[in-house]
From Swiss-Prot:
PROSITE patterns to which the protein is assigned, alphabetical: PROTEASOME_BETA_1, PROTEASOME_BETA_2
Gene name as annotated: psmB
Subunit: The 20S proteasome core is composed of 14 alpha and 14 beta subunits that assemble into four stacked heptameric rings, resulting in a barrel-shaped structure. The two inner rings, each composed of seven catalytic beta subunits, are sandwiched by two outer rings, each composed of seven alpha subunits. The catalytic chamber with the active sites is on the inside of the barrel. Has a gated structure, the ends of the cylinder being occluded by the N-termini of the alpha-subunits. Is capped at one or both ends by the proteasome regulatory ATPase, PAN.
Name listed for the protein in its UniProt record: Proteasome subunit beta
Main location, first listed in the record: cytoplasm
Originating organism: Methanosphaerula palustris (strain ATCC BAA-1556 / DSM 19958 / E1-9c)
Length: 211
């Protein structure tokens, strides 16, 4: 299996809306041309109001999720306050850069809400971190997802509008990218809560998108 197949075979999305951020992924995991799993988890909660999406090697992604969760909790214990989204992306960036000689095969998004409001960062395998403006997509399905996101995104989306946009963009990627598929996982982060969209609500939003 090539590095490109390992690193990019998925679709993950981040959308900033008026009151928070949406992190969304599909659920297919591949090994070359084979579908290895139809229920892969690609969004992890690493702090109270911060999530991380993963594309790339499953083992690398899971280890990084564990490390980030521990480090973010330690930050809160030591400093008496929650880590910011920017600080968490810097923490992840530094860790990946220190291991660049034996890199983690991942492409990540870190998004959440802190005292400055909602934000999302993309982080590559070498530790390069970039704060994205409003929308971002990673993985092999990202070109198709970006086509929908850039066409339909507008400032100050409501939560419902942002969820529908994420689902629409993922469905576009899943139709054309063989490494993306099986289902959709949506996380909503606001200043009040980190929550996952239930299957029942996902079906309702999907019906609205396809109507």
């Amino acid at each position: 299996m090539s590095e490109a197949e390992t690193l990019k075979g998925t679709t993950t999305i981040g959308i900033v809306f008026k009151d928070g951020i949406i992190l969304a992924t599909e659920k297919r995991a591949t090994m070359g041309s084979m579908i290895a799993s139809k229920r892969a988890k690609k969004v992890y909660q690493v702090a109270d109001r911060i999530g991380m999406t993963t594309a790339g090697g499953v083992g690398d992604a899971q280890q990084l999720a564990r490390i980030m969760s521990v480090e973010c909790n330690l930050y809160q214990i030591r400093r008496g306050r929650s880590i910011s989204v920017g600080a968490s992306s810097t923490l992840l960036s530094n860790y990946l850069n220190q291991n660049r000689g034996y890199p983690y095969y991942v492409q990540l998004l870190v998004g959440g809400v802190d005292a400055t409001g909602p934000s999302v960062y993309s982080v590559d395998a070498m530790g390069g971190a970039t704060r994205e403006s409003d929308i971002v997509a990673t993985g092999s399905g990202s070109p198709m997802a970006y086509g929908v996101l850039e066409d339909r995104y507008k400032k100050d989306l409501t939560e419902d509008e942002a969820i529908e946009l994420a689902i629409r963009a993922l469905r576009a990627a899943m139709r054309r990218d063989s490494a993306s598929g099986e289902g959709i996982h949506v996380v909503i982060i606001t200043k009040d809560a980190y929550s996952e969209l239930s299957e029942e609500r996902l079906e309702q939003y999907t019906a609205a998108v396809t109507a």
